[in-house]
Swiss-Prot record:
Pfam families: Spc24. It is found in: Nucleus; Chromosome, Centromere, Kinetochore; Cytoplasm, Cytoskeleton, Microtubule organizing center, Spindle pole body. InterPro entries: Ndc80_Spc24 (IPR013252), Spc24_Fungi_globular_sf (IPR038066). CDD domains: RWD_Spc24. It comes from Aspergillus fumigatus (strain ATCC MYA-4609 / CBS 101355 / FGSC A1100 / Af293). PANTHER family: KINETOCHORE PROTEIN SPC24, PTHR22142. The gene is spc24. Residues 39-129 form a coiled coil. Component of the NDC80 complex, which consists of at least ndc80, nuf2 and spc24. Keywords: Cell cycle, Cell division, Centromere, Chromosome, Coiled coil, Cytoplasm, Cytoskeleton, Kinetochore, Mitosis, Nucleus. This is Probable kinetochore protein spc24. GO terms for biological process: cell division; chromosome segregation; sister chromatid biorientation. Acts as a component of the essential kinetochore-associated NDC80 complex, which is required for chromosome segregation and spindle checkpoint activity.
């Protein structure tokens, strides 16, 4: 009988029915993209800082020239140049600040993705807590629901016990999508739709 088998063996067989490799690969690709974006951001930051230093030097030089030869300069033209340089300096400083904020946001998102990957790996390994083994060994559906919930998806059953509704939460955007599941569409279709909604 099913209950005569060792719970650890049942869990091992149940885990074999799940394939989290695509999720791991997707997270790896995201990590690679974030790393590339981080490198690009650092390069743009260096360029922005270099341009800011250059403009600061130019501004200082023009200020010195103004003080030394104010009588030989067109005051209106010089004032316009100063305003233009100040405007450029402000724009570059603002761009540098925005890049720094974006970097912090991406770092937070990367940490969140790493935590999610760790959760997925933990759910796919043997050696869970004893209470968890006892509770989940009897019902593989609980394992699936927990994995979905860890990804931000809550599956709801109707009165007949059929899963007919999914609530998808995008923590990055703070969005919530409710999907009524129609049996005429395949599980593959809904898996792709759920994933794109979480990433959107």
């Amino acid at each position: 009988m099913l209950l005569d088998e060792d719970p650890a063996t049942l869990i091992h067989h149940t885990i074999g029915n799940f394939n989290i490799q695509p999720d791991k690969q997707a997270v790896t690709r995201i990590n690679d993209s974030l790393s590339t974006l981080q490198q690009s951001r650092e390069l743009r930051m260096r360029d922005a800082e270099s341009a800011l230093r250059k403009l600061s030097r130019n501004l200082h030089a023009l200020t010195a020239q103004h003080e030394e030869a104010v009588s030989s300069h067109d005051s209106a033209k010089h004032a316009a140049q100063m305003v233009e340089l100040d405007t450029k300096k402000f724009r570059i400083a603002k761009a540098a600040t925005e890049l720094e904020i974006e970097s912090e946001r991406l770092e937070g998102e990367l940490e969140m993705l790493k935590e999610r990957l760790a959760e997925l790996e933990a759910q796919g390994l043997e050696g869970d807590e004893a209470t968890r083994r006892e509770r989940e060994a009897d019902d593989a559906t609980i394992l699936r629901l927990k994995i979905y919930r860890s990804l931000g998806i809550d599956i709801e059953a109707d009165e007949a016990g059929n899963f007919s509704k999914a609530v998808i939460r995008n923590s990055r955007k703070g969005d919530v999508h409710v999907v009524n599941m129609d049996p005429k569409f395949s599980r593959f279709f809904y898996a792709n739709y759920f994933w794109s909604t979480m990433q959107g």
